[in-house]
Amino acid sequence: MTWDRLLPSRKFLLAINSWYVLALVVAAISFAVLAIGPWKNEKSIEAILTELQSIDVDCALLQRNVLRAHAGLLRNYRPLMVPLGRVRSSIANLQQLFKKARVEDVGELSELLARLKSSINTTDAAVASFGAQNVVFEDSLATFNQSISSLLRTSDSRDLNAAKVPELGYLMLQFSFRPNTELALQITQSLDQLQMSTNADKVAIQEVVRNGRVILGVLPRLNETVKLVQASGTFENTKKLQRAYLEADSLARVVEQRVRTFLGAVSVFFCFGIVILVHKLRRRTDRLARRLDFEEVIKKIGVCFEDSTETKQSLKSSAEAALGTIENFFEANQCVLGLVNVTENEIAETFSASAPPPSWNERRIRKIVSLVQADEHGSIFRDYPARKASCFNEDAPGRWALVAFKVSDRLVAVFGLRFDRDPVQPASSEVQLMELAAGCVSHYVVIRCKQTQRDILERRLKHAERLEAVGTLAGGIAHEFNNILGVILGYAMAQNILHRRTYARHYIDRINAESNRARLIIDQILALSRRRERTARPFNLSALVREIAPSLRVALPSEVEVDFNIQSAQMIVEGNPLEIEQILMNLCKNAAEACIGTGRIEDSVYRSFVWKHKVLANGTIPAGDYILLSFEDNGGGIGQAALPHIFEPFFRTRAQCGGTGLGLSTVHGHVSAMAGFVDVISTVGRGTRFDIYLPTSAKKPVNSESFFGPEKIPLGSGEIVAVVEPDPVTLERYEETIAAFGYEPVGFNTFKGLTDWVLAGKEADIVLIDHSSFLDGERVGSWVATLEKVPIIMIGQHQKNVSISADGEASNHFLQKPVSSKALAYVVRANIRTE
């Protein structure tokens, strides 16, 4: 996976997580280093203990040297000063080491170090005092001994014995080794006696007495000083300091061990956190990679639906290709999608990526749909059922992962993935991907269906526009063509004036019949263009087809064989027989043109019941009872590209045949007008079949003669009929026709001529006015005020902006052109004033 493929938000999240991992790694290493690294300087500890031992040794050496100096074994006092200097140096070193080890502020150690320093200072002072006193003692003792010896050489022995000088020397020797009070008293007495001697050397005696007394005074103090040095607290303070330091060090080591354990635990915890975070990052990376792959799948699904054609086959192939992409992505063995119509509670569309598609269990489908509709918190239904609990029948092996959701208010999508293996429950992220994939395909399918419906509506709109064009064309030629038919019908109907039958009357009747049929054809064209209301009545379709069959055989080429398969039972539909005649003629002519050389056309009429909603090539048909009018040929067939457009006006598949392109459009218009449906099945090279479904009618059928048959024309009794027609030829025809019906015609070229005639005192029983008599649709209420209650009949198009009655009480009627003589006779007879 590359960073370029990630969204900025995903890059930011991954960057944050990477910094988290880096921070945890640094923290874990730091805590591990702190846990295993040295905390205390072992050299400092060793140096402190060495200095303490050195103080012990130097103090012991000092005490020994003091004793040796006191015993006179030392020639100088350097052996005393050297250990004392080392002790002072050790104290200074201890202070520096304690400061370096950061234990100088520890209360007990600081106090013990102060005591040790104080005891050393005391010892130092005692040693200094010992040195001074010992010098005085040794000098005095040497002088004393020398003076005693001098007295013994120079003085009389009798005087010396009397003064106990020899004994004094012996006592002083004893006192110097073992001083006590008794010896000091004896020596003092001896010194007093010696001082009182008169015969000896006075100077020597004075030296003996003085030095003896100095020895007696200095030696006890010297011994006390020696004892003070020997009893110095340096040893004890050193031991206490050593024990306290060792205890503090041991306690510090325990704390250090605990801290090390804690730091190690924290480091291990961070390591576990790193492992977990790396695992999560790996999973997130996998999910992101999965998402990226899924985005590629979504793009491929979009590509599958980029087909420009909107046919049903294209939709099926696109959906199957998209489902195949999803099937490969999830490594499934089959992928299916069903769209359920909620209103009709049935499956509208099914798609499968792999063949054969599974058969759906409608009962389980309805249950799933009900669960989706009953879900209040969302329209998603997820399930991973056992092998025998999915929405498919038992012929669908494997285990299915199902997702059902609402596509719209009318559609529920059921999406399934089949796995031949028995996988574990899918993760929530995989379920979300399934939902997104199913929703994407469903969305494209619905969009394609809507596009198809839109195209159908567009074709219908174009169809309506072309019909409008046909209507405009028909309206443009209707006036002239209707005038021609009117003249033909008018003069043909003049035969009613003749009371005797002639040989030519038969031909005139044929002229009337064909003119009436031409008028009906014009009416059908105008009805197709929505310019005239169609006439619909119930009739027997099977009887009508039997009646028309001979004419169809004659109208088609002899090389084309036409077979009719018509059920004998009555098949009542509601419509216009002429529409059925045009449907039969157009479809049979198209079938004959599709047959190359010899061909065969089979026309069938029978009842057909559609049990459920059915999809046709040109729409859908609801369930119900229908009359099926089927046309099947073995011609060349219709190509798939042309099939969606065959009902469009002016669309021609065979330009060389010279057709107008209105045949199938007229068929579709007539079938739609009869509330019917058209289905087309065509295979190129094999033929085409048109199935026309017409709804049945329960009404009583009428005879076909009610549409075309002759009726007796009502005649007048000399009533006055006023006619307003600008065209002189048409006016003459109206006058002749009205006269033939037994009325008295009065013709006018303008409406003003009629009003002038009325104002002159004339009166008409009924007035016929051509719509072209009103210039620019002007209001002529003031002109027709003189007509009072005379019935008025307008001929031509109904002009809503033309008022033809002054008081609104007169009966007004409109006759569409062309006006047949029969229709004119009926309207005049029904509305003429008889008072």
UniProtKB/Swiss-Prot annotation:
Residues annotated as domain Histidine kinase: 476-698
Record-annotated membrane-spanning stretches: 19-39, 261-281
Major subcellular site: membrane
Gene Ontology annotations for the cellular component aspect, listed alphabetically: plasma membrane
Enzyme class at the top of the EC tree: transferase
Pfam families linked to this entry: DAHL, HATPase_c, HisKA
Name of the protein described by the UniProt record: Limited host range VirA protein
Protein source organism: Rhizobium radiobacter (Agrobacterium tumefaciens)
